[in-house]
Structures are given as structure tokens and as C-alpha cells.
Amino acid sequence: VYYSNRDIRIEERPLPQIGAGELLIRVEASGICGSDVMEWYRKDRVPLILGHEVAGVIEEAGSGLRYKKGERVALIHHVPCLKCPYCLSGHETTCETLRKTNFDPGGFCEFLRFPEINASCGVLPLPDSLSFDAATFIEPLACVLRGQRIAGVQKGKSVLIIGSGIAGVLHIHLAAFVGAQPLVATD
């Protein structure tokens, strides 16, 4: 449980209870995002369990869902409504609903409750060939993909990537994959 960057504790918590349309997920892997270590961003909401780049196994599915126990999945922590003007114009990240969705608690735990709105459009089935660790890169790669789509990265266009951390490396690989050139990265 996160209290501050210098105060992280292992605590026992009750198993989350789910309702209709919700999922109980056994977490197998959770990535560490840059936002997980920004203390100023978290300090007003402590204590909390961080982690939103999550892959795991469905332990239990609430009534009304097509998912089954034992399915391997990656989870999308913020989901848009897909109905508002922002969503309908391809700007899902500005949707009002997006910031109100999440899972309970975060991914740095053994089990989490995946709410109905998330379960309706935020579950990605994983093939057996993809490891849980690799699946934690789905969310950051989606951010990179969206950024490059907005920036107009395409074959034959020059690209400068400033910063070669995790997101920067993903940008490098994606830009190279689409054939951007010259491709220059700094760190």
C-alpha cells in the first residue's frame, strides 16, 4: 500500500467482492508507470494501491458477462463512454467518463475488482503465446500509438524522439515499424 515514495507497506486487505457485470481478477503482472512514482500526483489520495498496467486471470465473472473463470486478460483502467462528442470524434482521452473509471484496488495486489463499466469494454483477451509481463506493455504502447497517430508519424517522415525511457523506446520501435526515417532519438 502506497503512503508516500518512502513509505510503501505490505498489508492484508479483504478479497474484493464483485457484483453483476463485474470481474474478479487474479493479478499476474502489473507494470510500473511513471505516474506511479510522482509523489505530488498521489499524496492527496493516500493510502492507495497503485498499478494500472495489469494482466491477469479471471477468477470470477459476475452475472451477465460472457467471460469465464480462467481466461487470461489484460485490463484497461480508464474506459471512455464511446457516446459523447469527444468519443465520437476520436478524442476518447478527453471523455468525461474516462477519468471516472478505474479498478479497485490498483494492480499492485493479488486480486482486484473490475467494475461493470470497465468490464463492458476494457477487457482484452490474451493469447497463450503472450506472457503476462509482455501484456503489461499494452497500455503504454496504446499511449504511444495514439501519440504517433496524432503526430502523423508515417513511412518516410522524419521523427525525433526526445527521451529514451520506456515510452521513448516504444516510440522508437513503433516509428521504425511504420518506416519513419530518418529516425533520431536522444536521451
Question: What annotation goes with each model-predicted range?
Answer:
Residues 81-158, 162:
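NAD(P)H dinucleotide-binding glycine-rich loop of Rossmann-like/cofactor-binding domains
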